[in-house]
């Protein structure tokens, strides 16, 4: 039965039945042959005494499963053929339907088809094959069940069985398609002649080792479980004893053995997408929309191109230049985190396509963007995330293999150009919501080898194959703004000296800011905001941002490349992946915990180059922050250790700047920044002692009977209790950090943070009381000099006042009112709990991937000789559709996946622990000596006479003023750029006789580029002047 072609169907589907034994494999122009395995008995004559066996409604013709047992019915003795009066046996549970399609065309009203129902049900068949029946349908129930909700952009035909248009796949009925009709007994013979979108059944004929009998096509898909008697049909039987049970109505995929031609000795397959997805696609005019491409990569990522692997953007009609390459790394995040990020990325791609006046982008701008998703470990990925990828058409279950010709597969690469997206609520969005096609590349790594290895696949394997201009790095869970990716790309387009850029990372506050009710989330919100207002703009003015966060950052691919000798930013960046044991000292190992900081330094200090890093204010991204104490401590451990040791590395190697091609002005600015960083490192190292001394002198001021606000020496008692409590708590913090994980000591860590908060509240109360008493005391003189007013009031007011001032300048002051109190209350925990735990765990430099080097075999393999391999694949289109249907149902029902327990902590090397001990002892002794010495020297002096407290307060105020000056400079430069760009755009709109430059679009990039390079141009002028002299 030939299927009528719909108007929108691509040629590949309409001509699919010309060769039923051919499967599309590999790129265009190099098709791979797929043929049936020969069987010695294929040409033997089939005995005439063997009659067709009647089948019941659950009968499903398909290929022979290699997992099913041989049918014992096929070995029964020969029986004479039935007479004309023979009536086929029909099970009592199968109703007689006089309007079955087999009787269509009869004149009697008895055989007329019933009118269509108004309730939307699934068809009884799919692509000419029966729907997988549920247990109830096997024993007489209706096989029809309500359809899942169709995508919003599906046409009427996709949402109603009563309509059909060019967006639907027409699946006509025939006598042989009805499992209830009398012609169903001859399904095996008729099935081979049907024509539809689905691939024809592939049959493997093999000799039976036991009896020497041969499989017939009518035997395919039939086993002993299909022979159901009346007694078993009465009920479902006893409940399953144990183990996972398959969902009712889900068809178990059938597989057949096929011979597949290898491409350059590697396994590359192209399979059709599921029918449901195909039915509502807006575009079906190319293979990239109708076929998914799978590649089993058996080499190291560094050898990807050399081994001859190619991506779709390198071959055939899809060969394109890549301007923007987006990397999304994930580990075990759930489907909500993934869809939140992926849907935001697709909306950003739509923004590129809406820029119709751009010389680079436009309606087909999506062809210049490739989104690469790298998952760290096949056994670590969340099952529902795989379902989300399958719903988008990027992933299909049952295709991947563990090995190809005894070579272990290192990564599974899936390529597909999807036209649908899933939002954070798991709802389909398509062209009606502005979603454009998106070229997706899904790399599922076989083993868990951490994030750095995922970036090596991205840069050294796929990046080398595509050679993009700009690479953007994202973490799953981060939601970029609607035009954030465009602003990141624009920073590289307007300034050719920019090698890296980052945006503003925001803490996800939830609906109506409800997450801010958690003090931990509120404190991180304040920290992120002040970093984006003070730190990032300051470093951007200097040209060196110490860290471009991996959650939202971008790099120029050309700037990352190594030199001819193999030395450069990428070689240093990936050096941390091979550091193990005593081959790397603790300093280097901890430094590469923040390898992105090393990459930033290597870019700025690259020999004979003048690369700079830039902060893009218009680029924003929301990310979920830790909301529990154990998760928060574990995250900050790696951040603090990596930042501390990476800062020391850059300070020690600052002389590399002298070999760069930076201007004199830029080098002067960078040296000023290094002095600032040196002070920051020193304050970080002595932060424990400085906090204790601040508490000792400020809170101890209330112990003076002349100042005591409570009287009766109560202030002295409170101070004494809190002082010894703080000392004991710091000692207990060392014990906790050395012997317990945060996940195993939640209550002690939480209690310590509460006590630190109480200490901070009392210290803040003491400071405000002293300030108010000083202001209201008529004997006190409010004048600048060596007094309490100058040392305490002015220094503290300037620090907090600068925070408010800069927040208002950037028009973002709300965090000062909603999150500042929580941050200052948790500030002692930042200085003590986090810092102590980080230094006490400098030995912890592993990522928990030891022992994960055994080749898995659960997916099967591709085995053969020469350039031909034999492998198992889904045999019918129905198998592909069933997997897609199950993925949609899993997403709709939101089935929870059991969470695996924490794995046992791996033993660390004695070398790391011994060095950790020496470092912790040195750090503890240094802070102890400073605290005891200063407290003894100034124990009997007032605040106005305490020079160390004065130094601490004014140092904090000075650093805050320095950051505010840099932030203000950045704001001025940003305002100038906006003004210049606005003026140029206005001049383009004006005619020439009014002073405009209509038609000269090149003026935009040149003018804006000059505006963003103020300091670069100034430095070049100074350098030229010095050379002339």
Curated annotation (Swiss-Prot):
InterPro entries: Chitin_synth, Chitin_synth_fun, Chitin_synth_N. Its main location: membrane. GO terms for biological process: chitin biosynthetic process; mitotic actomyosin contractile ring contraction. The keyword Coiled coil does not apply. Residues 1-160, 174-216, 234-257 are annotated as: Disordered. One of its GO terms (cellular component) is cellular bud neck. It catalyses: [(1->4)-N-acetyl-beta-D-glucosaminyl](n) + UDP-N-acetyl-alpha-D-glucosamine = [(1->4)-N-acetyl-beta-D-glucosaminyl](n+1) + UDP + H(+). Disruption phenotype: Leads to increased sensitivity to Calcofluor white, Congo red, and Nikkomycin Z. Results in a 20% reduction in vegetative growth. Reduces conidiation over 5-fold. Does not significantly changes in the chitin content in vegetative hyphae, nor in conidia. The keyword Glycosyltransferase applies. Residues 244-257 have a biased composition (Basic and acidic residues). This is Chitin synthase 2. It comes from Pyricularia oryzae (strain 70-15 / ATCC MYA-4617 / FGSC 8958) (Rice blast fungus). The gene is CHS2.
